[in-house]
């Protein structure tokens, strides 16, 4: 059966799952630098490409040049990322910081939003944002933090993307400020519809209202969605 075309589709702001979006959802597929370009994507399937902090030890200046080339090559690429900082992984933190700073500059130069992987480095990230003063918006994906952490990030102008595990008060704070997105990340059996259903119950609003608001936010946060066809 062909899925019903929704006026306000689900938006999966960050996914590593290979399936393409259908009539019910827009998907932002997160690709690493060495993964294939998304020329085959059509309709509601888009991509982000970035230098993940786990890869920082093997990155070079040439990696930055290749990243810029890939970001420019396809209009289906709507964001840079995932970039980020991770104090738990074994990659030297100094290299993570260097390449993250360079990705921030690149995102600003190309007018692309930045999708961020963040593990135990929130204070560093907040300081960097204050120092670098980027004009492109920053979205932290897979946010599971407490309301106090969410409040600090929201005060600093971040957007937060939530998966199947989230703190209900943190989601409510971000949603109330128009800075929440939802995602499936790397869980292939998880549907974006189920994440929306859980979030709508937590927020005490209808599924339709949630879809409408997050869809409108996505068109603003990811402006290349509009350049690729307007209303999906």
Residue ranges and their predicted role:
Residues 1-232:
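Mid-domain alpha/beta scaffold segments of enzyme catalytic cores
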